């Protein structure tokens, strides 16, 4: 089956970069996460949670997003390829600890000459807003900031903005943290893996945050 898939790829996209394959026995999430350490990007298919295989695929992709520091690109089952013209970067109010966190997003935007829309949902008086250093990291790139003060849940707010902008990709920043009362990574990323209708790029900020 793997050889058939490899041959099909060669027929569909002649001249593409070399394709190799491996079959490894083990639990899917830790195996994929361990392999991801040797690569720059993990690309996975994902589906909604309407039936068993969908739950399996969605849970696996979400689990890999949490288990690896390598960026993960989740492709919904019904997504079709189109050039990236608009990418929505949905952010919380925590700092981005280095430009390298955003480098995969910047490289994709450069490759497609895409516009980056930074989107933030204001969660109320305790909300600190968008880390201004994001603008510095994106200097020289086509980007803009957008805010929403809404009673909608964060995911619904993101979806509304994505649809309004007719975005081609959504990007989230997952965070490796010690103790933190913040639902953005765990809850929002999980829901997007199951619900998104466009490709989802999950980046990782590995700084340990110790809010109590």
Regions found by a protein language model. Give the residues of each.
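N-terminal membrane-insertion helices
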Residues: 1-6
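Small/aliphatic-rich secondary-structure junction motif
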Residues: 86-149, 163-170, 195, 207-209
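Glycine/Thr-rich phosphate-binding loops of Rossmann-like dinucleotide-binding domains
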Residues: 52-53, 97, 180-181
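Charged helix-capping and loop-helix junction motifs
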Residues: 57-60, 103, 131, 184-189
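Structural beta-alpha unit
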Residues: 7-42, 138-190, 194, 198, ...
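Extended, hydrophobic interaction surfaces within ordered domains
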Residues: 25-66
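Hydrophobic/aromatic ligand-binding patch that stacks against planar heteroaromatic rings
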Residues: 63-65, 108, 191-192
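Intrinsically disordered or low-complexity boundary/linker segments at protein termini
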Residues: 13, 41, 46, 50, ...
